[in-house]
Amino acid sequence: GKAKPMIVVMTNGNAWQDAAAGESPKGFVAPSMRPDERAKVAEGAFELSFPEIVKFVEKNFRTLANKKNRAIAGLSMGSFHSCNISKYYPDMFDYVGLFSGASTGNDKSTCPVYTDFEGKLKTQFAKKPALYFIACGKTDFVYKGVADFRKLLDDNGYKYEYLETGEGHIWRNWRIYLTEFAPKLFK
């Protein structure tokens, strides 16, 4: 195949939902996008606990346990998480994929994951990630945020790859992004 063999771990980064869409302690309900339920995302618990996920995988599976053999990627909110996790733990992942999303910091949060956004980004890029890949559709509702993030990277001379496709925040785009990203890993 085009991509190297790899272990893929898919976490539930949707911190205010206990399970897959439609499954929760509340019974079979549609996922909520209520701001009061999303508020806990700003506490950074998911990002702060991420090393535990890495430790679990490395303890239970045959892995190459080092930065050059780890990647993190996500779509939509997962892109937000991947951006923040990779900059908060700059020695953990050498490959970063942001599909339809990014982050530009959160001035209101006191969580260490979100504070000093630009300083942490500077540290991450000083360590020269092997690949920092960003992709977004032209009509995606997060397009402006991604453009702002890319401007920040450009203004600081940070190296990244960018792929722009048509359409918006849809699975068709995310499949394209993964198809482009995966073969670039671990080279």
Enumerate the language-model features and the residues they cover:
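Non-catalytic cap/lid and distal C-terminal segments of serine-dependent acyl enzymes
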Residues: G1-K187
